[in-house]
């Protein structure tokens, strides 16, 4: 019996380690709740994908022109739907295991360390970048609402509106996981469809403007080319929900007989139909009505009736509240995983309270300091949006499944990779030029 003791101790240690691991997984935001319905994934995906950037699509069309504009809109929709399908398929490709996080899939494809180095920095650039942009967008939309509703009120700085917007997140960020924010996400998804409908329906009711022109606005060839690159980025990065798709799928229950990919794919299809209903009418109707004179936010071109534009701005605020939460959740998960697994903090509500408040405060501070952050993201985001959305899923697919050379799957993946690389190189050039031109007007804490 004495000889058996070390073996028993070893088994006990393993059991303790497994129990601790399960306790941590049951606490972390991505894996703590796995009882989501398929329609949860639909509105989470709509909220993640339809950004306030949809209101800038007519302006992007004016930089691209009819032919290239429609081509990029449709190509981006098709390619990103294909890469999203790949990620949904790969979530449970290893029997008995789920890749609940983007970097776990990367680690399976490229190795433990390399997978982390490839995926995590890009995912963080997108998620933290989007959260900061939404801080500014929420603040700007609140400011616009205030100006429209109370036109003789004393002007209030954008900084204060960003603080007001952030105050909501100091409360909502303490909802523990994706399923607990499903109500917020549903409201956000409905709002995105609502303000998109207001944008294109109001434009259509105005009728085509007199002296409307559809040619390129820039006077020089260089200006036209740079604007084209910028418009390319604006359209392509309107589809950026891939950064949170595995994390959303992780909330859906799964068994060998009924894997999660069925309900998840149903949700994705519904989400993509809603995305098409938001993007295509806004982009095409907005450009058709206003031509190349359209503002970079179509609501600015509409101006009247003031009550309707004010309503649309409040809808934008509600939508970006939901979007912020969707993009913040994987970051909360990474921070909490690091503290609990690597630094051995105990998984407690107090820890979560400090971590999440710190994150909201940090994104609020950056948004207040750099209210022109959206211009910066067009540049930096190009290096992260294109890979995570357009070609990283294809590279992972090729690495794992190794389809036969020159087969349909092989060609489809390589077309997506080339298109994604093309975006990654060209769109930041347009973004950089925008920064250079607008830098004179950049003011900190405006």
From Swiss-Prot:
Segments passing through the bilayer: 38-58, 64-84, 116-136, 158-178, 181-201, 228-248, 269-289, 306-326, 353-375, 379-401, 410-430
Protein name: Lysine histidine transporter 1
Extracellular compartment spans: 59-63, 137-157, 202-227, 290-305, 376-378, 431-446
Organism: Arabidopsis thaliana
UniProt topology in membrane: Multi-pass membrane protein
Record function comment: Amino acid-proton symporter. Transporter with a broad specificity for histidine, lysine, glutamic acid, alanine, serine, proline and glycine. Involved in both apoplastic transport of amino acids in leaves and their uptake by roots.
Induction field: By amino acids.
Activity modulation comment: Inhibited by carbonlycyanide m-chlorophenylhydrazone (CCCP) and DEPC.
Molecular function as annotated in GO: amino acid transmembrane transporter activity; symporter activity
Residue spans, topological domain Cytoplasmic: 1-37, 85-115, 179-180, 249-268, 327-352, 402-409
Lineage start: Eukaryota, Viridiplantae, Streptophyta, Embryophyta, Tracheophyta
Entry keyword set: Amino-acid transport, Cell membrane, Membrane, Symport, Transmembrane, Transmembrane helix, Transport
Pfam families, per database record: Aa_trans
Tissue and organ expression note: Expressed in roots, stems, flowers, leaves, siliques and pollen. Found in the tips of roots and in the rhizodermis of emerging roots and in lateral roots. Higher expression in older leaves as compared to joung leaves. Detected first at the hydathodes, then in the epidermis and finally in matures leaves in all mesophyll cells. Not detected in vascular bundles or in seeds.
């Amino acid at each position: 019996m004495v000889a058996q003791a070390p073996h028993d101790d070893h088994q006990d240690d393993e059991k303790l380690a497994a129990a601790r691991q399960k306790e941590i997984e049951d606490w972390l935001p991505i894996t703590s709740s796995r009882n989501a319905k398929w329609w949860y994934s639909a509105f989470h995906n709509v909220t993640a994908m339809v950004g306030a950037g949809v209101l800038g699509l007519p302006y992007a069309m004016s930089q691209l022109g009819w032919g290239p504009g429609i081509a990029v809109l449709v190509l981006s929709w098709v390619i990103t739907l294909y890469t999203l399908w790949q990620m949904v398929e790969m979530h449970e490709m290893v029997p008995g295991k789920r890749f609940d996080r983007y970097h776990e899939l990367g680690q399976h494809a490229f190795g433990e360390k390399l997978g982390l180095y490839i995926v995590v920095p890009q995912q963080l650039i997108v998620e933290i970048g989007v959260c900061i942009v939404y801080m500014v967008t929420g603040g700007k939309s609140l400011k616009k609402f205030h100006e429209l509703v109370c036109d003789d009120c004393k002007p209030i700085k954008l900084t204060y509106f960003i603080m007001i917007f952030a105050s909501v997140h100091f409360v909502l960020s303490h909802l523990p996981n994706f399923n607990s924010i499903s109500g917020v996400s549903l409201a956000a998804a409905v709002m995105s469809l609502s303000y998109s409908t207001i944008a294109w329906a109001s434009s259509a009711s105005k009728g085509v403007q007199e002296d409307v022109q559809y040619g390129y606005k820039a006077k020089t060839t260089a200006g036209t080319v740079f604007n084209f690159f910028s418009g390319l980025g604006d359209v392509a990065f309107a589809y950026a929900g891939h950064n949170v798709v595995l994390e959303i799928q992780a909330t859906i229950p799964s068994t060998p007989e009924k894997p999660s990919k069925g309900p998840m794919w149903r949700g994705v299809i519904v989400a993509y139909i809603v995305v098409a209903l938001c993007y295509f009418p806004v982009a095409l109707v907005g450009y058709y009505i206003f031509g190349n004179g359209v503002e970079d936010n179509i609501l600015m071109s509409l101006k009247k009736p003031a009550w309707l534009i004010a309503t649309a701005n409040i809808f934008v605020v509600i939508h970006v509240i939901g979007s912020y939460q969707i993009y913040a959740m994987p970051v909360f998960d990474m921070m909490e995983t690091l503290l609990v697994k690597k630094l051995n903090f105990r998984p407690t509500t107090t820890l979560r309270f400090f971590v999440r408040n710190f994150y909201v405060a940090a994104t609020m501070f950056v948004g207040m300091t750099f209210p022109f952050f959206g211009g910066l993201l067009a540049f930096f985001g190009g290096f992260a949006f294109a890979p995570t959305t357009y070609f990283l899923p294809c590279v992972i697919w090729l690495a794992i499944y190794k389809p036969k050379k020159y087969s349909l799957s092989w060609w489809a993946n390589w077309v997506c990779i080339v298109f994604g690389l093309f975006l990654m190189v060209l769109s930041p050039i347009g973004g950089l030029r925008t920064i250079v031109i607008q830098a004179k007007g950049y003011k900190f804490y405006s």
